[in-house]
Amino acid sequence: MRGYFGVGVEGVSKPMNLGNLMRIAHAFEASFFFSVAPRLKLSDANSDSSNAEGALPFYSFPHPDDFRLPLGCRLVGVEITEDAIELPRFRHPTRAAYVFGAERFSLSPAILKACDFVVKIPTRFSINVGMAGAIVLYDRLISTGGYGARPVKAGGEGGEVPPPHTWGAPLARPRDETPG
């Protein structure tokens, strides 16, 4: 899979939720993790048994105005808004950072304004931030990970996984060697 992605949360206040989201990001091979205006410290996320805090670069931004991403990285907010794109209809950017709202709060207006895209998971009501993270990252994996087509028959195995791209020698036009 080409590209990279990061995962973050704004205003997180519960250690278990921070640890859970970090573990999910680590499991899906995120390149980095971040928090915006956190209400706790990274060391409080003691619920993570995968040692994600030791495996992922972690960036903390005290205020939404301080938030920065790598050049070319697109910010994808995950929030229930009227104009949000439903996740099954969304094409994930190659270079992306996904930001989730905290337990009792929506994403702040400043973060929503910074988002290149806002997506929503088509559920009847809001779900836990860790669960939302798992759903979004699984959707990214399935839609960008090079998996074959789904089977038509229930319980059947999907199509073949396409082989990874191999780079060959540069192609060049043959020179016309006739004297002119």
Describe the function of each predicted region.
Residues 1-180:
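Post-transcriptional modification and biogenesis factors for structured RNAs
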